[in-house]
């Protein structure tokens, strides 16, 4: 945690939970802005500092909103939705920023070191997030090629030019002890010299060449990629063989059953191609940029599916997607907490509309067959039907007319019922959405109270 002196009462501070859309800009609380900034400082730029590096970031301030330059600060510090940031005002429009993860613990960043310093000490610090992601990747390698491994790309591992290597993979290929020279190679054959190093804790990582490979192949934070080890050379070669961008879109068609039980299966080719092979949290963002938290689960056959209960149904309703209609999701971020964004709705008739269309087609085809010359029932019945028709002419309604009017009445009832059902479904979706929003607000309030309590405890220590 940040030390008590940094958060003492003499240093005014505020905290902000990071919600969807925070990457573009961030609002300074109105009360803090009016009491400590507005009218007290000239200029429209603030300076941000953090423990992650010695760099000072200049960010433009539009009113009480941080705008130009904020996105670069976010990317450099790998800030994500559900993180919290504490701004400590050090005076003269300078803020020290402390980042906290969803667990309210301070995020530990790697030290800014050079490769030469790393060689002398034999150790390189990496962020806790990368350690967690590395451990998660080691859970299941059985279904994949033993000479392959998947890796998440982050802004942090790009800027530090180093990336963790799954320990099982390193051990299996004799790369888990000491230092080994390797070559990183893309699919076109372009290569970069690099090294694999280990430390006392058992951690293994690739040092050097990573930043250049990502730049050359347009890999950026949030992407995932797969490497294959080529052992037919004196120096091990890690060849890039796939990336998330090649198959980041997936088409899903919810059924009545999947909407009711709140579960949607994902294509095996999509999940394996993007490294989505571990259960955990998953985030879906709808067309209005509202975030939905659900689960990524594994079924008995090893397939992956989204499970959200009523939230899955509400998510589809929010995007105006019904049973039998298709939607396309775009995978924005892989890793431990995959992020999907609604991309488009594929227009097609629902099951009920399709069924009605087939019924109309059958009726139409039947009339066409009669027109072509096939004898109708009326023709086959002959004199008996003529007798009934004469009776109808005298005033008694025929069964045919009764049946026709009966069908019209039933049709009107069906239409009325369909409208009622539709209204009920819309109402249910709205209620589900409101429930989700209220639950999220309650979680934020709880988190806010915890942070306030922590700050009070820190103030007491000072």
UniProtKB/Swiss-Prot annotation:
One GO MF term: DNA binding
Residue ranges of the annotated DNA-binding region, renumbered to this chain: 11-103, 148-243, 249-346
InterPro entries attached to this UniProt entry: B3_DNA-bd, DNA-bd_pseudobarrel_sf, REM_fam
Polar residues composition-biased segments: 399-418
Record-level GO cellular component terms: nucleus
Keyword DNA-binding: yes
SMART domains: B3
Xref: Pfam families: B3 (PF02362)
Disulfide cysteine pairs (residue numbers): none
Location relative to the cell: Nucleus
Name of the protein: B3 domain-containing protein REM8
Organism: Arabidopsis thaliana
Gene that this sequence comes from: REM8
């Amino acid at each position: 945690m940040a030390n008590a002196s940094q958060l003492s009462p003499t240093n005014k501070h505020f905290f902000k939970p990071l919600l969807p859309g925070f990457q573009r800009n961030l609002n300074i609380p109105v009360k803090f802005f009016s009491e400590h900034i507005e009218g007290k400082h000239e200029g429209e730029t603030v300076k941000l500092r953090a423990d992650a590096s010695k760099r000072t970031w200049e960010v433009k301030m539009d009113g009480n909103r941080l705008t130009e330059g904020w996105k670069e600060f976010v990317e450099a510090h790998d800030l994500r939705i559900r993180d919290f940031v504490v701004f400590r005002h050090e005076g003269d429009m300078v803020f020290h920023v402390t980042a906290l993860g969803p667990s309210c613990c301070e995020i530990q960043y790697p030290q800014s070191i050079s490769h030469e310093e790393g060689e002398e000490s034999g150790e390189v610090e990496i962020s806790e997030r990368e350690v967690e992601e590395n451990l998660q990747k080691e859970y299941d390698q059985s279904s994949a090629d033993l000479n392959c491994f998947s890796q998440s790309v982050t802004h942090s591992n790009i800027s530090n030019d180093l990336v963790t290597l799954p320990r099982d993979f390193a051990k299996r290929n004799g790369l888990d002890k000491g230092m080994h020279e390797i070559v990183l190679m893309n699919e076109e054959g372009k290569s970069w010299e690099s090294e694999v190093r280990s430390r006392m804790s058992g951690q293994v990582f690739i040092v050097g060449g990573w930043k250049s490979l990502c730049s050359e192949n347009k890999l950026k934070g949030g992407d995932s990629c797969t490497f294959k080890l080529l052992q037919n050379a004196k120096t091990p070669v890690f060849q890039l063989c796939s990336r998330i961008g090649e198959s980041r879109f997936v088409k899903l068609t919810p059924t009545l059953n999947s909407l009711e039980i709140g579960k949607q299966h994902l294509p095996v080719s999509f999940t394996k191609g993007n490294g989505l092979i571990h259960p955990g949290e998953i985030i879906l963002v709808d067309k209005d940029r509202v975030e939905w938290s659900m689960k990524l689960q594994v079924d008995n056959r090893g397939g992956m599916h989204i499970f959200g209960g009523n939230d899955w149904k509400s998510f589809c309703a929010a995007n105006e997607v019904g049973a039998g209609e298709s939607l396309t999701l775009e995978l924005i971020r892989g890793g431990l907490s995959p992020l999907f964004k609604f991309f488009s709705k594929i227009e097609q008739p629902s099951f009920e509309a399709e069924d009605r269309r087939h019924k109309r087609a059958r009726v139409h085809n039947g009339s066409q067959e009669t027109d072509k010359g096939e004898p109708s029932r009326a023709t086959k019945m002959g004199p008996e039907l003529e007798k009934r028709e004469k009776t109808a002419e005298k005033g008694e309604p025929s069964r045919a007319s009764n049946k026709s009017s009966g069908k019209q009445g039933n049709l009107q009832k069906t239409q009325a019922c369909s409208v009622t059902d539709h209204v009920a479904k819309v109402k249910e979706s709205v209620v589900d959405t409101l429930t989700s929003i209220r639950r999220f607000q309650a979680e934020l309030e709880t988190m806010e109270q915890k942070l306030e309590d922590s700050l009070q405890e820190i103030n007491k220590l000072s």
